[in-house]
Curated annotation (Swiss-Prot):
UniProt protein name: 4,4'-diapophytoene desaturase (4,4'-diaponeurosporene-forming)
Biological source species: Staphylococcus haemolyticus (strain JCSC1435)
Gene Ontology MF: a single term: 4,4'-diapophytoene desaturase (4,4'-diaponeurosporene-forming)
Matching NCBIfam families: crtI_fam
Catalytic EC class: oxidoreductase
Entry function: Involved in the biosynthesis of the yellow-orange carotenoid staphyloxanthin, which plays a role in the virulence via its protective function against oxidative stress. Catalyzes three successive dehydrogenation reactions that lead to the introduction of three double bonds into 4,4'-diapophytoene (dehydrosqualene), with 4,4'-diapophytofluene and 4,4'-diapo-zeta-carotene as intermediates, and 4,4'-diaponeurosporene (the major deep-yellow pigment in staphylococci strains) as the end product.
GO biological-process terms attached to the record: carotenoid biosynthetic process
EC numbers, comma separated: 1.3.8.-
Family affiliation: Belongs to the carotenoid/retinoid oxidoreductase family. CrtN subfamily.
Pathway annotation from the record: Carotenoid biosynthesis; staphyloxanthin biosynthesis; staphyloxanthin from farnesyl diphosphate: step 2/5
Keyword check for Flavoprotein: yes
Catalytic activity: 15-cis-4,4'-diapophytoene + 3 FAD + 3 H(+) = all-trans-4,4'-diaponeurosporene + 3 FADH2
């Protein structure tokens, strides 16, 4: 069958490879000049910068795309484990190093608060059990029909997940030390949600890091996008770049998708898989005569969105290889207040930051004796935000806030004077480059009312031959999760093809 895939992000690339491996003719249409979507990369002044995701968790999910497509992961992607997860900076004189080695981790916990290891390990154990239930019965199912969700067994399993608690409440049940609570809670920001709003199941993120470890891909995260592209091409996938999809063609008589309008031209296909951000699809790509019934433009506007981010990609004329680790987190003095600012629309005065130094691990990504630095500051999305990112003064203020915070770290003292390359990325860039509604960095917020059956579906409930995958669809955001979205959606398509649907 001839299948169109809209979007060459990691979801579209992975799904296309899976479909092509089964013998189908797949064409990907990507509006930008390179593949990768949020997992893009750029080079500037001798530095190589990943633009979006940076942390490799659950490597088995990465490998599965290749192995289930009949290839060896190692032939496409060079990945290795890191012994160190991240450094946490609570203040300029208060740093905690988090290791994948349980003995070292226990020493760190006991140094932070004697006796805390038992509660921490019990947290990991209990959350791992929930993760296994969530993965098998929720994350890896498409919930095509109401009966697949609304049945006694599924609802019982959902209750076992205890999702009515938020992440903060769950963590507090196991850990009393405020620093350790922060260490666990901040990671819900990886998918753009407030830990006091996010269902407790999203506390799986620190568990995954501790149990499965954190890995690094040679050449940066873009190495995965390149590997997926090559995998697809080896199976015959065609990729058209600078190909702006303007409409999904719907046959109103038979209520089915049968093509796309791309750069003004009609292109016919047997099936369409759209991995563009779902809110954008609902509001901009569906024909006027054939909308998505449960996702009117008004409803899409009123849905809950994850936070956005302000990023600085900087080249530093300083060798930091022996002074910093690849992944680092710097906490605001008032972490709770910082979170409240983000989700109430305010620019943080004292932010929490995520710092990524890939050239510490991979010297090829920066000139000799220099270091590439990626800084992410969570900020409000554009609907909630009171921030005018078109104002150059506001951008300068955001930069000042970040550099002032960076300079509280000993290795980054007076860092501004050593910046030799700088690029910023604002919520407006998320909106324009990725068609992300309200500049949301992680798509729709995974609240209880926007999860599982209540999240935009992988199989259209309105039209035949139309499918959706990606961060704003089921099961949610984060690289392992969107790879799962690609998997279950491709499998649903193959099942429909097999049964003549």
């Amino acid at each position: 069958m001839x299948i169109a895939v809209v979007g060459a992000g990691v979801t579209g690339l992975a799904a296309a490879a899976r479909l092509a491996a089964k013998g189908h003719q797949v064409t990907i249409f990507e509006k930008n000049e390179q593949v990768g979507g949020r997992m893009s990369q750029f080079k500037k002044d001798g530095f190589t910068f990943d633009m979006g995701p940076t942390i490799v968790m659950v490597p088995d999910v990465y490998k599965a795309v290749f192995e289930e497509s009949g290839k060896r992961f190692e032939d496409y992607v060079d990945m290795k484990p890191l012994t160190h997860i991240f450094d946490i900076y609570f203040s300029d004189k208060d740093k905690v190093s988090v290791s994948t080695d349980l003995a070292q981790l226990s020493q760190t916990l006991e140094a932070t608060e004697p006796g805390s290891t038992q509660g921490f390990m019990q947290f990991l154990t209990d959350v791992y059990k929930r993760y296994e239930v969530a993965r098998k019965y929720f994350l890896e199912r498409t919930f095509r029909k109401p009966s697949e969700f609304y049945n006694p067994l599924t609802l019982y399993r959902g209750l076992k997940l205890k999702t009515f608690n938020n992440a903060n409440q769950l963590i507090d049940n196991y850990v009393s030390n405020e620093k350790i609570r922060k260490l666990l809670a901040f990671q819900t920001l990886y998918i753009g949600i407030d830990p006091k709003q996010g269902p407790s199941i999203y506390s799986i993120i620190p568990m995954i890091e501790m149990v499965h470890g954190v890995h690094y891909i040679k050449g940066g995260m873009y190495g995965l996008a390149q590997g997926l592209l090559q995998l697809g091409q080896d199976h015959g996938v065609k990729v058209e770049l600078n190909a702006d999809v303007q409409e999904i063609i719907i046959d109103p008589k038979f209520k089915r998708a049968d093509g796309l309008r791309v750069n003004g031209d009609i292109r016919r296909f047997d099936k369409v898989l759209c991995t563009a951000d779902f809110p954008y699809v609902a509001q901009n790509l569906m024909p006027v005569h054939s909308p998505l019934k449960n996702y009117s433009p008004e409803k899409v506007d009123n849905m809950d969105y994850s936070c956005s981010a302000f990023l600085i990609y900087a080249g530093i004329n300083r060798q930091l290889r022996d002074k910093l680790h690849v992944h680092n987190v710097v906490f605001a003095r008032d972490f709770r207040g910082n979170i409240d600012d983000i989700f109430s629309g305010k620019m943080p005065d004292d932010p929490s930051l995520y710092l990524y130094f890939p050239s510490v691990e991979d010297e090829a990504l920066a000139p000799k004796d220099q270091t590439g630095m990626y800084v992410l500051m969570p900020v409000p999305e554009l609907k909630t935000g009171e921030i005018d990112w078109n104002d150059p003064n506001m951008v300068e203020k955001a930069k000042d806030v970040i550099y002032n915070k960076l300079e509280t770290i000993e290795a980054l003292k007076d860092i501004r004077q050593d910046v030799v390359s700088e690029t910023v990325f604002t919520p407006l860039d998320f909106e324009s480059r990725y068609n992300a509604k309200f500049g949301s960095a992680f798509g729709l917020m995974p609240t209880l009312t926007q999860s599982n059956y209540y999240r935009p579906p992988n199989v259209s409930r309105d039209y035949k031959d139309l499918y959706f995958a990606g961060a704003s669809t089921h099961p949610g955001a984060g690289v392992p999760i969107v790879l799962t979205s690609a998997k279950i959606t491709a499998e649903a398509m193959l099942e429909d093809i097999e049964h003549g649907k």
